[in-house]
Amino acid sequence: MSDFGINLDAICDNVRRNSSNSSIKSQVSNRSSRKMDFVDEDELSTYFNSKTSVTQSDSCSNDLNVKHSIIAEAVVCDESAHVSADAVQEKDVVVPKMDESVMKWMMDSHDGICVNGGLNFSKLKNKSNEHETKVTSETNVSAHVSAGINSQLGMFNPIQHKIKKEAIPEMFEDEDTDECTCRNCPYKEKYLKLRKKLKNVLVDIITEM
């Protein structure tokens, strides 16, 4: 009877070899059996060219044209509110308005300045007596400026004007008379300075028109 020997080293090598081959085969079979999902080119193009979903960081394309189009078409969002800058944002338009106190002063002023669809400058020379006020002479210098005043913008929109430059000084020729009732008023000096400044502004406006 012959000796029957078992080579354990050879068996171990075969087991290791078979196990490694089986693991490789299983990995290959798993890879081959796995469903390969590819991205549709139309959907990808739609994504990259969509302003609602693309940001400036989505510039990973290797195609320079696509990359530049992504950056150019990317939406700029607010960091806090994430609001698209492409959306129409309504802004409150600030409408400049004349102060009511200035308006009232112009309406009630004895200088004859009134605003009623235009600027009408009329001047009356008044002389006061002790018992009565008598109008000795009346000088009506009417510089009617037909100006379209846009109430919304609060600006002068000159349409037409009829005035001579040499007639401008005549409007204010008797402004600085001392015959007014407020000659002893402590604010008279300040009032005269302010009135003179307003006159200069009005003269400049009329001259420029």
From Swiss-Prot:
Keywords: Glycoprotein, Host cytoplasm, Magnesium, Metal-binding, Nucleotide-binding, RNA-binding. It holds the Pfam family Rota_NS26. It is found in: Host cytoplasm. GO terms for cellular component: host cell cytoplasm. GO terms for molecular function: ATP hydrolysis activity; magnesium ion binding; nucleotide binding; RNA binding. Mg(2+) binds at D86. Signal peptide: none annotated. Its main location: host cell. O-glycosylated. Its cofactor is Mg(2+). One of its GO terms (biological process) is viral genome replication. The keyword Ribosomal protein does not apply. Belongs to the rotavirus NSP5 family. Plays an essential role in the viral genome replication. Participates, together with NSP2, in the formation of viral factories (viroplasms) which are large inclusions in the host cytoplasm where replication intermediates are assembled and viral RNA replication takes place. Orchestrates the recruitment of viroplasmic proteins such as capsid proteins to these factories. Homodimer. Interacts with VP1. Interacts with VP2. Interacts with NSP2 and NSP6. This is Non-structural protein 5. The lineage of its organism: Viruses, Riboviria, Orthornavirae, Duplornaviricota, Resentoviricetes.
